[in-house]
Amino acid sequence: MTLDDAALKSFGFIERPTKNMINIDPLQTGGILTEDARRALVEWGDGYSICDNCGGVLDLIKKPPVQKFIHEALPEFLGVDEVRITHGARESKFAVMHAIAQEGDTVILDGLAHYSSVVAAQRARLEIRKVPHSEKPDYHIDPEAYGTAIEETISETGKAPALALLTYPDGNYGNLADAKKIASVCHEYDVPLLLNCAYSVGRMPVDAKELGVDFIAGSGHKSMASCGPIGVLGVNNDNGDYSDIIFRKSPTNKNKEIELLGCTARSATLMTMIASFPEVVKRTRNWGNEVADARWFSEKLETMGLIQMGQKPHNHDLMFFEAPNLYEISTRVKKGRYFLYKELKSRNIHGIKAGLTKFFKLSTFEVGRENLSYIVDSFDEIIKKYE
């Protein structure tokens, strides 16, 4: 590519065409910036602006109040002993795996684990054993199955897994497994539990100590109204000196933590998380209403012939639907499998991936009952239009 003036016109400022649409994309609903975060995005957008008053350790910066945020506010919010900021939930998971386990050790993953959990384990050169889930339509994770997976690992390898992980909720069906029971089962074998909370921390109340988990990974850009990439990593020391292991320092660069490569998310990403934090804390207190909205929405779509997969009654805003009637329509209309995406787009609704009709997932988080009613009416109109 020749970087002449004509070629460079492809870049520069690019407007986002979906920014004013009603958003039901599970990846995006929890990451929409608050107004304070939008102001912070501009104020702290310069690359290393966070380092105006840095003494060499990101999480110890006092102006702005990064130290207070990371070492006081976030531990209280997450129910953990120590917190660090990372570049995302996947980086948090990898840091734990890489620090806790040795090459060739086994990590136990739930059968609904996100691909990034698998890749993180592979990057750490670990063996993976998955806990099976029940079949359609529930996709249930049995806590006792973690014990079975651990015992099978001990039988085959001669030692317990280095770590177990639970996705809470899973990113396909929005199921919330019994994390407290699973933690208890794992601890019977002295196996620590990592909770992947990419879709929960910042949306709903999550207290790691109450659940009995050792590590918690959260996503700022997915669920804490932050610009990405940014995540959180929380560590509890009730079952071991895990903070010393995870946050060990370099012997040569004595104030730099090895697993974090020194400093992680900074400037715009961190400052948008801090700016949104007051509203994020408050919105988790409204979780009961969010669940009520999700259940109401699911019930309405099911009256039209769609089928919600996963837990019922549902306990999360992320939902997966099977839509045989929409799929049937897609087999005979001119727009084919893109008809649903185009119909929703024409009604200012964004979030269901283009080309999906038979199965799709969506999120009702902070969409509001009025907009959800409009979306329900839109589905009704679309189905009747093609009957």
From Swiss-Prot:
Subunit structure: Homodimer. Interacts with SepRS.
Positions of pyridoxal 5'-phosphate binding: A89, R90, N196, S219, G220, H221
InterPro entries the record matches: PyrdxlP-dep_Trfase (IPR015424), PyrdxlP-dep_Trfase_major (IPR015421), PyrdxlP-dep_Trfase_small (IPR015422), Sep_Cys-tRNA_synth_arc (IPR013375), SepSecS/SepCysS (IPR008829)
Biological processes annotated in GO: translation
Stated name of the protein: O-phospho-L-seryl-tRNA:Cys-tRNA synthase 2
Reported cofactor(s): pyridoxal 5'-phosphate
Domain of life: Archaea
UniProt organism field: Methanococcoides burtonii (strain DSM 6242 / NBRC 107633 / OCM 468 / ACE-M)
Transmembrane intervals: none
Protein task: Converts O-phospho-L-seryl-tRNA(Cys) (Sep-tRNA(Cys)) to L-cysteinyl-tRNA(Cys) (Cys-tRNA(Cys)).
UniProt similarity note: Belongs to the SepCysS family.
